[in-house]
Design a protein with these regions (language model features):
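Long, contiguous hydrophobic alpha-helical segments, chiefly transmembrane helices and signal peptides
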Residues: 8, 35-38, 116, 152
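A short linear-motif detector with a strong N-terminal bias
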Residues: 5-6, 55-59, 101-106
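Glycine/small-residue-rich interface belts in oligomeric ring/scaffold proteins
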Residues: 17-99
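Internal, well-folded beta-alpha domain core
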Residues: 65, 69-74, 80-188
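N-terminal, Lys/Arg- and Ser/Thr-rich interaction peptides
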Residues: 1-22, 33
Length: 188
């Protein structure tokens, strides 16, 4: 079997975690839906805002999932963190959002606090067993993209490096054999 392998990295990343609303936390690693969204952007598929805007104009019911998810949900991926023990340092960023509608406070200034991942890096593997996966491989190998890939939001540009097609083999275990699966952290 063949798989696409590449390293996904950036200076910073922000994958919003909605646990609290006084400060915006980030997930510690890229999650599947964020990765699918980034791959969908590379291929030019619609996301949440594009889907909602188009349907609101037509007074149509908003479907459960955006275009990128409908098209890419079945691809088989593995995300392997290159961080020490799978973790990346986080840094608190504070900035002002001074557009008038950002805050109902006097002056319309909203102070935003976000935790960003510093220098994140992952090895991404995509099994090339369907047309969508092969299309992703074509775009990434040939450095094509409809929309720029980001690591969570447009403040965090994504670097895609070390792109290659690799051979992988399926492992089957017997009753007396254990197979260790390390899909998030590299084996030491």
């Amino acid at each position: 079997m063949k798989a696409l392998k590449f390293t996904l990295s950036g200076n910073s990343a922000f994958f919003k975690d909605n646990v609290i609303n006084t400060v915006y936390l980030t997930y510690g690693n890229i999650h599947r839906v964020a990765l699918l969204g980034m791959l969908g952007a590379i291929l030019g598929y619609g996301g949440y805002s594009k889907q909602n805007d188009m349907l609101k104009k037509k007074n149509k019911k908003i479907p459960d999932y955006p275009e990128f998810y409908e098209k890419l949900k079945d691809i088989k991926i593995s995300i392997v963190s290159n961080g020490k023990n799978g973790y990346f340092n986080k840094k608190l960023q504070t900035f002002n959002n001074s557009v008038g509608y950002a805050s109902k406070e006097e002056g319309g200034n909203l102070i935003v606090k976000q935790f960003w991942l510093e220098n994140p890096s992952w090895d991404i593997y995509i099994l090339l067993d369907c047309d969508e996966a092969k299309k992703i491989a074509d775009y990434i190998q040939n450095r094509k993209a409809i929309y720029l890939p980001y690591l969570g939001s447009n403040d965090h540009l994504a670097n895609i490096m070390d792109v290659e097609i690799i051979d992988i083999e399926e492992k089957m275990s017997s009753e007396d054999e254990t197979i260790e699966i390390l899909s998030m952290i590299k084996a030491s």
